[in-house]
Amino acid sequence: DIACFAAWADRIFTVGPGAFYSAETFTDYPPGFMYVLYLIGALRSLLGIPYYSSLHIMLLKLPAILCDMACGCLLYKEATKRLHFSEIQSVCVACAYLFQPAIILNSSCWGQVDSVHTLVVILMGLFLMDGKMLPAYAIYGIGVLLKPQTLIFTPVLLVGILDHVFLQDFSWRKFFYN
């Protein structure tokens, strides 16, 4: 995928988002992630980074690595807040995620962007647990635009709506507001 990401980043920066999708070019990602690649293409062009150099590849992997780190931070925060873990226990939870070989290999080595999707799903779940419906809907929509695999979590969103809106003193207003 990293070779596709490199080509797509250059293409979307060169031709623009409006002309990016065409019959001549293989693109199997939705437009959300293409805007991330647009920024990478712009940075590469602005800084004169050689195509497919080590720095270019690092730039392409950076969104996934940053999302891995954000997931680790969220796990730390939630372990402390919701589970009432001690600071050291929360650090262990975050490290258990951040240093598992699958996470490191997937993002840092292979260059896959599954952690972008993972971060979106975690955020959606946290917003649903807090009864923050509009942010949950927005994050879900962004997730679908980033990776269509987010659709797999539609039942989670629907159960959150059912729980918050219909099972707790029904009100249509709660469909949109806390």
Language model region names:
Residues L74-K77, V116-M133:
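Specific aromatic-rich, kink-prone transmembrane helix
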Residues V93-F99, Y140, V144:
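Short helix- or helix-capping micro-motifs
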Residues I2-D28, G32, I40-P50:
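Extracytosolic helix-loop segments that constitute the early lumenal/periplasmic catalytic or substrate-binding loops
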Residues S108-V116:
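Short acidic/glycine- and proline-prone juxtamembrane loop motifs at membrane-interface regions
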Residues M58-H84:
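Transmembrane-helix motifs of polytopic, lipid-linked glycan transferases
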Residues L62-A70, S115-L123, G143-T150:
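Membrane-embedded alpha-helical segments of multi-pass membrane proteins
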Residues F153-N178:
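Perimembrane helix-loop-helix junctions
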Residues E87-V91, F127-G141, F170-Y177:
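Short hydrophobic alpha-helices at membrane interfaces in multi-pass membrane enzymes
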